[in-house]
A protein has these predicted regions:
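Glycine-rich phosphate-binding loop
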Residues: 1
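N-terminal helix-rich module
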Residues: 4-11, 18, 22-48, 52, ...
Length: 194
């Protein structure tokens, strides 16, 4: 019957602890990246759903982002008086709610609309987000038309470990594109290439 000495057992336990200490942070970073990427896809899908709502309803439908208790909520509204979805029309009830309020953190723990400090602009045609992760103009509304076009803008999304993604909305087509910020190179890369 083979037996192990106390020194052999301590060596094996020490090696296992070292491997675990190295692997756990990398595993947590991978989980955070996956969760943040999924949240970016979720946000892009919600925008595309709103675009399809506008086409099928033959009316302008928009997503409004609101800061509530330090977290952003987003909800869909349909134009009620043919002048576009406006904040004052939402408040007065003219533009009615068609998609209930939602929060990224409710589906993806630790993920929010945010921008890490000193984040560069996505490209030469845009500005850096600074402290505003919702780059849709002063109203924080992205509108989609019955012809499939939209207003343009960017939504910055980050996770607990500062994994950074952006959902870009292109006005001429109403389509979205997801990019990830590579901290090593300091560049934005298409999420589809990662």
């Amino acid at each position: 019957m083979a037996a192990f000495s106390l020194i052999e057992i301590m060596f094996v336990l020490g090696a296992a602890a070292t491997v675990s200490a190295v692997a756990v942070p990398e595993t947590l970073a991978t989980i955070d990246d996956s969760r943040t990427a999924a949240a970016a896809r979720y946000a892009a899908t919600r925008l595309q759903r709103t675009r399809m709502d506008a086409v099928t309803r033959s009316n302008i439908v928009a997503v409004r982002f609101s800061l509530v208790s330090s977290h952003y909520e987003f909800a869909g509204y349909q134009d009620g008086n043919r002048n576009g979805v406006l904040s004052r029309d939402i408040q007065s009830g003219v533009d009615r709610l068609v998609q209930p309020a939602d929060r990224l953190g409710d589906h993806f723990p630790g993920v929010e609309f945010c921008a890490i400090p000193n984040l560069p602009a996505v490209d030469s045609t845009s500005t850096a987000p600074g402290t505003d992760p919702i780059r849709l103009g002063s109203s924080d509304i992205v509108s989609f038309t019955p012809s499939g076009t939209s207003s343009s803008g960017s939504l910055y999304i980050c996770g607990r470990r500062k994994t950074q993604y952006v959902v870009r909305i292109y006005g001429e087509t109403g389509k979205t594109r997801i990019l990830k910020f590579n901290t090593g190179s300091g560049q934005w890369l298409p999420a589809s290439e990662l």
